[in-house]
């Protein structure tokens, strides 16, 4: 069941799946792309806008050690006929 426009949902993104498949020095950049792809798939959104705080959390321990999972709050809105997902850190 897709998220209705205007709703907020908390997701736990499993970044560990990506960490195993890429070299150590590519982990944080690949984790950022994975978060974007994962949210787009689960929120059924064409565009995903990630808050800078989420990016800072991914890069907090450097490029080789992103977190294993990340709790995020996703708000979906409808703009010009497209679904847009806004991603923030969950409290």
Curated annotation (Swiss-Prot):
UniProt family annotation: Belongs to the eukaryotic ribosomal protein eL31 family.
UniProt GO MF annotations: structural constituent of ribosome
Designated gene of the protein: rpl31e
Keyword terms of this UniProt record: Ribonucleoprotein, Ribosomal protein
SMART domains per UniProt: Ribosomal_L31e
Gene3D superfamilies for this protein: 3.10.440.10
PANTHER family: 60S RIBOSOMAL PROTEIN L31 (PTHR10956:SF0)
NCBIfam families (alphabetical): PRK01192.1-1
GO BP, sorted A to Z: cytoplasmic translation
UniProt GO cellular component terms: cytosolic large ribosomal subunit
Taxonomic lineage of the native organism: Archaea, Methanobacteriati, Methanobacteriota, Thermococci, Thermococcales
Name of protein: Large ribosomal subunit protein eL31
């Amino acid at each position: 069941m897709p998220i209705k426009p205007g709703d907020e949902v908390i997701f736990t993104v499993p970044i560990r799946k990506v960490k195993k498949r890429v070299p150590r020095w590519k982990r944080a950049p690949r984790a950022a792309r994975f978060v974007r792809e994962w949210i787009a798939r689960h929120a059924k959104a064409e565009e995903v806008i990630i808050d800078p705080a989420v990016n800072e959390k991914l890069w907090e321990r450097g490029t080789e050690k992103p977190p294993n999972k990340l709790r995020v709050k996703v708000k979906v809105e409808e703009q010009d006929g497209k679904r847009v997902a806004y991603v923030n850190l969950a409290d």
